[in-house]
């Protein structure tokens, strides 16, 4: 329990929606705990430090799913010594030092890979407690921060990855990836589908265009899924792509087995009411799917963390990878015509999921911060030349 005034600084990043969603889940949970002595602040470090360059990098990141896959692949799978020579390791350093001296946090929580934090812990000898929430299912070197006291990871396999990389087992907690508590709540599937003017007796296929709406060819997929699985119905989530939503609505306006939606706050209800989901394997989306025990098909996952997530889920029997739309259509047909296989996949997910991840993480964070040093003890160790960066 926090009995003295304490402050948590959350460092996150807006490359995709997942890291921000994790941050918001944690902030919401801490706020619900009504801790009068605790303040929580969050910063999108890279965007605040270098807004123009980061905006360019974000556009490149989004487009990398379509045009620059090999470039991103080389970056993601580069060796640690190559990263050490890269400017990325020092990206945001001045801003981070400025934040630490200005805010004087009692604990730093990372919800985004932040290699620059390693520079502080290794070169500046700052010993503020650091905790990291990893938002994917396979470990990557960018998530490791020397002298970090806690890593919150998705599975025991992820923990083993960190141990193999040299992180002490006692620093790693298997909590699952934090998602909103509503994904733990019971949903009346029949009532929800009826409210949405869909048939509760039909298998429902949930399709998502992804956070950036970068995928195309959904009209072809929907037509062929219904042709090969005529007893099914399809719910298509277009995200923020208004053009995709408008196009698909026009094409399927007279088909009662197809529902086209834009951005929705009801992914929880749709996941709980569907038998199968076609999606990109972002860490948060598949964690929500795991919580709802809905088998998934990963369509042409991008090299890097998403492909590693897809490999992991496929190896565990939670989903299948489809390299092409036609392959995805065939997998849908096979699974919807084999109800027992879907049940087995859902059962494996039920056995493996870790519930109430956000609560577990917040409880442990409070324990960590309760044992943290006083700010005067910490900030007396900040080198004088570091103060040059304070604005």
UniProtKB/Swiss-Prot annotation:
CDD domains: GT28_Beta-DGS-like. One of its GO terms (biological process) is glycolipid biosynthetic process. It catalyses: a 1,2-diacyl-3-O-(beta-D-glucopyranosyl)-sn-glycerol + UDP-alpha-D-glucose = a 1,2-diacyl-3-O-(beta-D-Glc-(1->6)-beta-D-Glc)-sn-glycerol + UDP + H(+); a 1,2-diacyl-sn-glycerol + UDP-alpha-D-glucose = a 1,2-diacyl-3-O-(beta-D-glucopyranosyl)-sn-glycerol + UDP + H(+). Its EC number is 2.4.1.315. GO terms for molecular function: 1,2-diacylglycerol 3-glucosyltransferase activity. Disulfide bonds: none annotated. Gene3D superfamilies: Glycogen Phosphorylase B. It is found in: Cell membrane. Pathway: Glycolipid metabolism; diglucosyl-diacylglycerol biosynthesis. GO terms for cellular component: plasma membrane. InterPro entries: Diacylglyc_glucosyltr_N, Glyco_trans_28_C, Glycosyltransf_28_UgtP, Pro_diacylglycrl_glcsylTrfase. It comes from the Bacteria. Its main location: membrane. Keywords: Carbohydrate metabolism, Cell membrane, Glycosyltransferase, Lipid biosynthesis, Lipid metabolism, Membrane, Transferase. Belongs to the glycosyltransferase 28 family. UgtP subfamily. Processive glucosyltransferase involved in the biosynthesis of both the bilayer- and non-bilayer-forming membrane glucolipids. Is able to successively transfer two glucosyl residues to diacylglycerol (DAG), thereby catalyzing the formation of beta-monoglucosyl-DAG (3-O-(beta-D-glucopyranosyl)-1,2-diacyl-sn-glycerol) and beta-diglucosyl-DAG (3-O-(beta-D-glucopyranosyl-beta-(1->6)-D-glucopyranosyl)-1,2-diacyl-sn-glycerol). Beta-diglucosyl-DAG is the predominant glycolipid found in Bacillales and is also used as a membrane anchor for lipoteichoic acid (LTA). This is Processive diacylglycerol beta-glucosyltransferase. It comes from Staphylococcus epidermidis (strain ATCC 12228 / FDA PCI 1200). The gene is ugtP.
């Amino acid at each position: 329990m926090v009995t003295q005034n304490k402050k948590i600084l959350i460092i996150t990043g807006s490359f995709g929606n997942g890291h921000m969603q994790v941050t918001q889940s944690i902030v919401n949970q801490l706020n619900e705990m009504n801790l009068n002595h605790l303040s929580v602040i969050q910063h999108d470090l890279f965007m605040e430090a270098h807004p123009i360059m980061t905006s360019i990098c974000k556009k490149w990141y989004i487009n990398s799913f379509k045009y620059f896959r090999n470039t991103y692949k080389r970056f993601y799978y580069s060796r640690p010594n190559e990263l050490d020579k890269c400017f990325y390791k020092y990206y945001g350093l001045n801003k981070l030092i400025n934040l630490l001296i200005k805010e004087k946090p009692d604990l730093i929580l990372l919800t985004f890979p932040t290699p620059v934090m390693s520079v502080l812990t290794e070169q500046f000898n700052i010993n503020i407690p650091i905790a990291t929430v990893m938002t994917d299912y396979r470990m990557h070197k960018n998530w490791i921060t020397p002298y970090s006291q806690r890593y919150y990871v998705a599975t025991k396999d992820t923990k083993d990855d960190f141990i193999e990389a040299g992180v002490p087992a006692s620093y790693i907690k298997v909590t699952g990836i934090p998602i909103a508590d509503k994904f733990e709540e019971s949903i009346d599937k029949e009532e929800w589908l009826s409210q949405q003017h869909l048939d509760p007796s039909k298998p429902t296929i949930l399709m998502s265009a992804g956070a950036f709406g970068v995928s195309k060819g959904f009209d072809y997929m929907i037509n062929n899924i219904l042709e090969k699985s005529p007893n099914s119905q399809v719910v298509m989530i277009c995200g923020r792509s208004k053009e995709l939503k408008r196009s698909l609505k026009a094409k399927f306006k007279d088909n009662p087995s197809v529902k086209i939606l834009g951005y929705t706050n009801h992914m929880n209800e749709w996941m709980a009411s569907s038998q199968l989901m076609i999606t990109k394997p972002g860490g948060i989306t598949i964690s929500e799917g795991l919580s709802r025990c809905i088998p998934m098909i990963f369509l042409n996952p991008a090299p890097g963390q998403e492909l590693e997530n897809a490999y992991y889920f496929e190896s565990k029997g939670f989903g299948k990878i489809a390299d092409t739309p036609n392959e995805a259509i065939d997998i849908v047909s096979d699974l919807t015509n084999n109800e027992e296989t879907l049940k087995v996949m859902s059962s494996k997910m039920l056995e493996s999921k870790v519930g109430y991840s956000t609560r577990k993480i917040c409880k442990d964070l409070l324990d960590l911060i309760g044992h943290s040093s006083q700010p005067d003890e910490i900030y007396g160790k900040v080198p004088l030349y570091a103060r040059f960066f304070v604005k």
